[in-house]
């Protein structure tokens, strides 16, 4: 949709004023915003035209307007500059640096800690996933006896990460059992993509190991198919947002399903992706999810996202998200703080 520059400036101003005040924006407030460079009559005409285009809505009989979902989509696609971490004030940058310096670098602890800090910093909910690579697989298995009836299955990924799972064997497990089944796993499950784990392959491994050791085989299968883990922090901030809190139950339900949560916050490409709640399935009107990919080294990538109202302060929050994603990737890659 081609739109005159003046209409674009007015839409941009209404998005900013509505984000700050939470009330419909009238021509008088707009005139003050533009330092009286445009008359109230001119602004009323332009607002009426933007309403006809479907970019503004009039929520009640007052003269004020608010951005529609279509208006926010146009703003996000055409009017807001690509966020740059360099746009952050030095004080905000140093504060984020200090936050990461205090975090545990272990991925399973770093991801929720980063999401929690991002939520507290922005006043939105924040979500993140542990890093993953499209072609990640298991390169080596070890099976360690940790008790008479328990074995720890350790898997080293092709990116050098370690996954573990404990299996219980009701009939007991010897050291020889652990060594033999480790050999079996290394012959049958290393460098196998999750989608290639056929029922026939798993049945053959259980047959070779014996039924009593099948829990160890199942633990190894779970390690092969483990995907990125998603977490949600700061949900309490959504409960304070009148236009978002009705969606809180839906959001929590999505995050109870790790695969659905990971897909929800997955950005498109390397740029910041903003998804309006009305475009989601199920729809979450009044909500917006802004996500960014982070690079964790070795081909590993993850996602970090802000979840809040469609009237969030995009110009302030997107550079914060951009810098947070960069810092999270650096910390994951072990590049220091």
Predicted segments with their positions:
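Short, flexible active-site-proximal loops enriched in glycine and acidic residues
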Residues: 21, 58-62, 82-91
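Hydrophobic residues on short alpha-helical segments
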Residues: 11-15, 72
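Short helix-capping/hinge SLiMs at alpha-helix to coil transitions
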Residues: 16-23
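N-terminal helix-turn-helix
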Residues: 24-79
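Short alpha-helical segments that sit at the start of domains
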Residues: 1-12
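Intrinsically disordered, acidic Ser/Thr/Pro-rich low-complexity regulatory segments
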Residues: 83-337
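Conserved, well-folded catalytic cores of nucleic-acid-processing
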Residues: 17, 33, 53, 74-82, ...
